[in-house]
């Protein structure tokens, strides 16, 4: 078998038969078996040698690939009978060709691209090496933490004011909204006290009032809500006013200054058509009625006078307090007219009583205090009579006529003979002892007899103790003072805690 891989570019005569072609058109191969009996000797003109022909070679099988066939023309072909032989043995080129061109092609060139398989059997050929993907096996790691946010710039600390924080209910300093009144009220601190500046309908007006007061109280360096240049006119006016006077001016300008239908404080229009003046919240009372007046000004002046009497120069008035200097009593007179409101009952010394005071109307001395041991301890001191004598302006219970209680018994002041007789007998052993200061004595010039003690039954429990009796006896007035008091043309009631009650005196008389 001989494999011919040489193709003759020109001169190779091939005889193709269209019937012998394969229908697939992909590849053709034919194995030609030459037999000795059927083989013919090539013609003489085809050979270039004149020697006799040699015997034919043994039959050979030729494998021919159609893809290696050239496109030479078939003009030099012999007869149809010699097709198979010519295909097996190619004829030499014609004489007119100077040389024979042979082209050798490699079946599997090394530099050629990968061969194409006609049957497209991709699984029979190895694929060209492909770049392997970069596959890495990593251990499971926690997800990376997100980057921390950039640090926010810290706001600068607000300047701490010297006057405390701003109000929670208002954006202005010194202004607070009160739900009870429905107004914006302004206050300022001065010397540890909160000063009321007035109530206003708007927070802006209240802030203006605070700024004026702050400039007056603390100067131009005060912390205010608005610009200092807005208050140049106010600063010129406030130079001639004191703090109290300027506060009064601010209060009069406020909305909450006046109440009712009048523009003046403490003045309202009565249903009868006149103007009523009254002052509120004094000594626990809701208001104090001051009277009806024909004009608002008169009612306002009446209110101002009452406010000054009760609150002094710090009172809030409709007009300047200086306008009432000639109409109001002086401070010394007001202090002399003060009433001692200590809760205890004491009798002034006889030297303090004068006919002018005796001719006055009924006066009652009321003392706020306690009946506890403080008074009894004070009564044990030897200086108790001098202390009582040094207290001026006492109001004893004085009458120009003898009391009628001696003839008509009273449930609180019983006046029976047994009680008088028992009290006289109890007083006889101590003739030289001074009269107690804790007694209500009945003294009158119509009765030359010794003064009778009117016992009080509701003090019997505390007066029956021996300690209280001795204390009262040691702190009493002298006998001369008692005699002088009895010589006056008045009747004085004194309470004696040592005097027994009616029930105790009756029991004492029964035992005797």
Swiss-Prot record:
Tissue expr: Mostly expressed in roots, seedlings and leaves and, to a lower extent, in stems, panicles and developing seeds. Present in spikelets.
DNA-binding region ranges: 171-227, 263-320
Induction line: Target of miR172 microRNA mediated cleavage, particularly during floral organ development. Repressed by SRT1 via epigenetic histone H3K9 acetylation (H3K9ac) regulation.
Ranges annotated as biased composition (Polar residues): 21-32
Gene3D superfamilies linked to this entry: AP2/ERF domain (3.30.730.10)
Extent of motif Nuclear localization signal: 159-168
Residue ranges, compositional bias (Low complexity): 42-51, 460-492
Reported function: Probable transcription factor. Involved in spikelet transition. Regulator of starch biosynthesis especially during seed development (e.g. endosperm starch granules); represses the expression of type I starch synthesis genes. Prevents lemma and palea elongation as well as grain growth.
Gene name of this polypeptide: AP2-1
Subcellular location: Nucleus
Classification via InterPro entries: AP2/ERF_dom (IPR001471), AP2/ERF_dom_sf (IPR036955), DNA-bd_dom_sf (IPR016177)
Keyword check for DNA-binding: yes
Assembly: May form homodimer. Interacts with TPR2/ASP1.
Keywords recorded for this protein, A-Z: DNA-binding, Nucleus, Repeat, Repressor, Transcription, Transcription regulation
Name of the protein this chain belongs to: APETALA2-like protein 1
Biased composition (Acidic residues): 78-88
PANTHER family associated with the record: AP2-LIKE ETHYLENE-RESPONSIVE TRANSCRIPTION FACTOR, ETHYLENE-RESPONSIVE TRANSCRIPTION FACTOR RAP2-7
